[in-house]
Design a protein with these regions (language model features):
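Extended Gly/Ser/Thr-rich low-complexity repeat segments
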Residues: 46-59, 93-103, 179, 263-271
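A structural detector for beta-sheet-dominated domains
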Residues: 7-9, 25, 38-40, 60-62, ...
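Glycine- and charge-enriched low-complexity intrinsically disordered segments
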Residues: 98-102, 300-306
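Amphipathic, non-transmembrane alpha-helical segments in extracytoplasmic/periplasmic proteins
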Residues: 37, 97-120, 135-159, 202, ...
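Short beta-strand and beta-hairpin "edge-sheet" elements
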Residues: 60-85, 269-294, 299
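Assembly/oligomerization scaffold segments
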Residues: 1-92, 184, 250
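Short beta-strand-centered interaction patches in the first periplasmic/extracellular domains
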Residues: 80, 87-88, 122-193
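Acidic, small/polar-enriched beta strand-loop surface segments
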Residues: 1-8, 48, 157-159, 166-294
Length: 306
């Protein structure tokens, strides 16, 4: 751990503290990036430093970087402290209600980012306009995740930025590296593609549309939001079909190295002599960097192609 750093409130404290378990989870969808770290505390230093919820913390080990995280809990135990932090400040996880008329997706993203002092980036996401949008007693992150899911997109929160990306755009990106699955590698995979949906019908009770990707049963979703047009319903049906099918085929690999150059939301070229059907591109849906043991655990899915 020669290049390892723990940056707390802008200061590298690693030379002054001992670190036990430390891992960061990055996710391309479904949850916010998180950090869990155990500090040895035989001299009771943490209590003197008065750690507080909302403090900023980050860990680094070469190219592997958690990005800025916000402390959610500090749990003292015998001779140690366990700190849990998330990539979004607590305010972004608090429930709120609001409505908009004639608003673009980019405006929703920018407003939420500004409210929490964060930046905002989009990749391949079309800036659709909505006639009416309502956020009803839900957190800003849950609200944005839902709206982006309708549009076949996802949300990553990393290092003080909201990153919205199109699923199709992500799958079209070149591989950032290669992973090999050879005999002896610790892996497991599951293929539920036979139970995937072939299409999706979306309705708000008044406006409906169906989008089909091929053979298979049809998913029916009744959404609480007002759908502005048949075209919008078709887009949402496609987006919800993506969300329902994107983990139908998945693999988990455990490695003896950190995989420092890999991140959730990237594409890798999988060479799988032990599971040849997986040869080719795969999407990193989640990755856990274990900074203490210098290992990684990678969750992969296969590109959907729509």
């Amino acid at each position: 751990m020669g290049s390892f750093k723990v940056i707390y409130q802008g200061v590298d404290i690693y030379p002054k503290v001992s670190v036990g378990h430390c891992w960061a989870d990055g996710r391309a969808w479904g949850a916010t990036d998180s950090l869990t770290i155990d500090f040895g505390d035989t001299r009771n230093l943490w209590d003197r430093w008065h750690p507080e919820v909302g403090d900023e913390i980050a860990v680094e080990d070469g190219a592997a970087r958690s990005g800025t995280m916000y402390v959610s809990s500090v749990v003292p135990q015998s001779s140690r402290f366990t700190v849990t932090a998330y990539a979004a400040p607590q305010s972004a996880r608090e429930r709120r209600s609001k409505s908009w008329e004639r608003v673009h997706l980019s405006q929703l993203l920018a407003e939420v980012a500004d409210r929490h002092g964060m930046g905002c980036e989009t990749y391949g996401v079309e800036d659709h306009e909505y006639q009416y949008v309502e956020q009803d007693n839900e957190s800003d992150l849950a609200f944005l995740d839902r709206r982006l899911t309708y549009e076949g997109a996802g949300l990553i929160v990393y290092d003080g930025r909201l990153v919205a990306y199109s699923g199709e755009w992500l799958e079209a990106q070149g591989a950032t590296g290669e992973l090999s699955v050879t005999p002896g590698v610790d892996y497991e995979f599951r293929d539920d593609s036979a139970r995937s949906y072939g299409g999706c019908t979306v309705t708000d009770g008044t406006t409906s549309a169906t989008w089909s990707a091929g053979e298979g049963k049809t998913l029916v979703r009744v959404v609480p939001e007002r759908i502005g047009s048949v075209g919008e319903a078709e887009r949402w049906a496609k987006g919800l079909l993506r969300a329902a099918n994107r983990e139908a085929t998945r693999m988990v690999i455990r490695t003896d190295s950190m995989l420092r150059g890999y991140a959730a939301g990237s594409v890798v070229d999988l060479s799988a002599s032990a599971a040849a059907s997986w040869d080719g591109p795969a999407v990193v849906s989640r990755i856990r960097h274990d900074y203490y043991d210098s290992k990684a655990k990678v969750w992969l899915t296969r590109p959907l192609g729509y």
